[in-house]
């Protein structure tokens, strides 16, 4: 099926690529795709294209990669050029998903039907850069995807549609991300079809109550503070998979913790102390309870289940992981 609605798409990571693919597969024209500039990544730090750029190029969609859309920012000339490109590209609506650049009011005003954002939370909870991570870290029972009509605020626009998803006890950011991306793709295609049919989309202002912010994840947050309760640390490990992972330091070596669950058997051991190192998991004492670590990675190594890790890097009861500086 082909559609008459023309969609400029702005997004960068896999979450956004899923939405772009759904829009394209549904038959909506995408006369322009915006994504962030290629970034160095991987061990070789070679420039890599975003997931959105890769999809667009594979399907013959025009791509632009401005470093900014703000005339008053660090790249005024590039921003001005990008804004002129937007004005010169015939389109009806812009869809934005995890783009990573601020859209000033000047840009929001260009599309006839404005800009629709696909946000991976149940707004107004978890506005901001890392809603999936923060929902798991906080122990939320559910999250979801919200479509909103963008305004100049940070994820403050009126809500068009939302979908709820339960957070499973073993969900990581990686697994939850994939379900949310699929839901977001489904929602945006449905909304675009309604917009084409009706010429408008009803939207409801976000409530003033329940606002929280999902700050961007920093590498410094990876360190596991064994003084915390075991259930808190287990959520942290799940929330930080795939990035930045949980980090436990032993004798100066940073060991990444990729899977863990609360366990019994702490005894009176000090936080960070290895209580047991068994093939089914390494039990570490926490501030409250104990954590059974079931997947680890030594520096320069691969993720391994506890059995394989211990075969090459033995650990023993009584060893103690370092405690990070408080605060």
UniProtKB/Swiss-Prot annotation:
Keyword hit for Transferase: yes
Q: Where does (6S)-5,6,7,8-tetrahydrofolate bind?
A: 121-124
Positions of transmembrane segments: none
Please verify whether the record's keywords include Signal.
Answer: no
User: EC annotation?
Assistant: 2.1.2.9
What Pfam families does this protein map onto? Answer: Formyl_trans_C, Formyl_trans_N
Q: Name one GO molecular function term.
A: methionyl-tRNA formyltransferase activity
Q: Which UniProt keywords apply?
A: Protein biosynthesis, Transferase
Its domain of life reads Bacteria
Q: Which GO terms describe its cellular component?
A: cytosol
Please name the Gene3D superfamilies in this protein's record.
Formyl transferase, C-terminal domain (3.10.25.10), Formyl transferase, N-terminal domain (3.40.50.170)
Please write the reaction equations for the catalytic activity of this protein: L-methionyl-tRNA(fMet) + (6R)-10-formyltetrahydrofolate = N-formyl-L-methionyl-tRNA(fMet) + (6S)-5,6,7,8-tetrahydrofolate + H(+)
Q: Which InterPro entries match?
A: Fmt (IPR005794), Formyl_trans_C (IPR005793), Formyl_trans_C_sf (IPR037022), Formyl_transf_N (IPR002376), Formyl_transf_N_sf (IPR036477), Formyl_transferase-like_C_sf (IPR011034), GART_AS (IPR001555), Met-tRNA-FMT_C (IPR044135)
Enumerate the PANTHER family for this protein.
METHIONYL-TRNA FORMYLTRANSFERASE (PTHR11138), METHIONYL-TRNA FORMYLTRANSFERASE, MITOCHONDRIAL (PTHR11138:SF5)
- Per the similarity annotation, which family is this? Belongs to the Fmt family.
Q: What does this protein do?
A: Attaches a formyl group to the free amino group of methionyl-tRNA(fMet). The formyl group appears to play a dual role in the initiator identity of N-formylmethionyl-tRNA by promoting its recognition by IF2 and preventing the misappropriation of this tRNA by the elongation apparatus.
Name of the protein described by the UniProt record: Methionyl-tRNA formyltransferase
The source organism is: Burkholderia multivorans (strain ATCC 17616 / 249)
What is the gene name?
Answer: fmt
């Amino acid at each position: 099926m082909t559609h008459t609605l023309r969609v400029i798409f702005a997004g960068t990571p896999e979450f956004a690529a899923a939405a772009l693919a759904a829009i394209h597969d549904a038959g909506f024209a995408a006369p322009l795709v915006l994504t962030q500039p290629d970034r160095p990544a991987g061990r070789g730090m070679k420039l890599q294209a975003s997931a959105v750029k890769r999809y667009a190029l594979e399907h013959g969609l025009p791509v632009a990669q401005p470093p900014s859309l703000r005339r008053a920012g660090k790249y005024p000339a590039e921003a001005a050029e990008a804004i002129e490109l937007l004005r010169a590209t015939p389109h009806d609506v812009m869809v934005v998903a995890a783009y990573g650049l601020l859209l000033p009011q000047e840009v929001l005003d260009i599309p006839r039907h404005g800009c629709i954002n696909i946000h991976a939370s149940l707004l107004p909870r978890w506005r901001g850069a890392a809603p999936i991570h923060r929902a798991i870290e906080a122990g939320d029972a559910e999250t979801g995807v919200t479509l909103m009509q963008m305004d100049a605020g940070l994820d403050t626009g009126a809500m068009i549609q939302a979908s709820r998803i339960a957070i499973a006890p073993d969900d990581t950011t990686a697994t939850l991300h994939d379900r949310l991306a699929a839901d977001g793709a489904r929602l945006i295609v449905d909304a675009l079809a309604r917009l084409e049919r009706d010429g408008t989309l009803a939207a409801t202002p976000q409530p003033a109550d329940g606002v929280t912010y999902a700050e961007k994840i920093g590498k410094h947050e990876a360190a596991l503070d064994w003084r915390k309760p075991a259930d808190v640390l287990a959520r942290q490990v799940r929330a930080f998979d795939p990035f930045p992972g949980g980090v436990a330091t032993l004798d100066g070596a940073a060991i990444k913790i990729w899977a863990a669950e609360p366990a019994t058997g702490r005894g009176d051991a000090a936080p960070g102390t290895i209580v047991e190192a068994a093939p089914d998991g390494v039990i570490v004492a926490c501030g409250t309870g104990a954590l059974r670590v079931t997947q680890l990675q030594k520096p320069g190594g691969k993720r391994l289940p506890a059995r394989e890790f211990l075969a090459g890097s033995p650990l023993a009861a009584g060893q103690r992981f370092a405690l990070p500086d408080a605060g």
